[in-house]
């Protein structure tokens, strides 16, 4: 994971990416790596988000049960309660909360898409792509979120944050270029 200082130099100015927010949206940041959590926390706070950190899936489930969360940024590979188990519980208990999963294992893409994940991003993260993905998911209509979770014809996303229209029309998961 790049440091917050390096990450800041790679992204665009906030005004170019997202409209001004009057209410701070809350992001639950779940990663067992304190360095990753700290770097992402700093970047997201600078962008105007309120960030609630969690060390693992169990802590994330406890926090989302007692807090109002707008989006979850979830590492898949964690000890104790892994990201997949955590995602399944979040999507069952809080289906309107979009989840972005992050992983160092790109082969998990197809499983993530078929599971109804809002987006999957590969480590090391490109901060500008992360910020664009967060903004897009927070602005996404509720019907799209519900359709994705129900496995209906919702746009599929992959690591670059694009939609694969050809696979959508075939009814299969998006494939990277």
PLM region spans:
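Two-component/phosphorelay signaling modules centered on CheY-like receiver
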Residues: 34-52
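Hydrophobic/aromatic residues positioned on beta-strands within the core alpha/beta folds
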Residues: 100-102
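Acidic catalytic/metal-coordinating carboxylates
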Residues: 55-59, 82-85
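Alpha4 helix (beta4-alpha4-beta5 surface) of REC/receiver domains from two-component response regulators
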Residues: 85, 105-122, 132
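Active-site residues of response regulator receiver
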Residues: 75
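Non-catalytic signal-transmission and effector/linker regions of two-component phosphorelay proteins
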Residues: 1-26, 128-177
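Receiver (REC) domain active-site loop signature in two-component systems and cognate sites
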Residues: 78
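Short amphipathic alpha-helix used as the core "switch/output" element in two-component signaling
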Residues: 62, 84-96
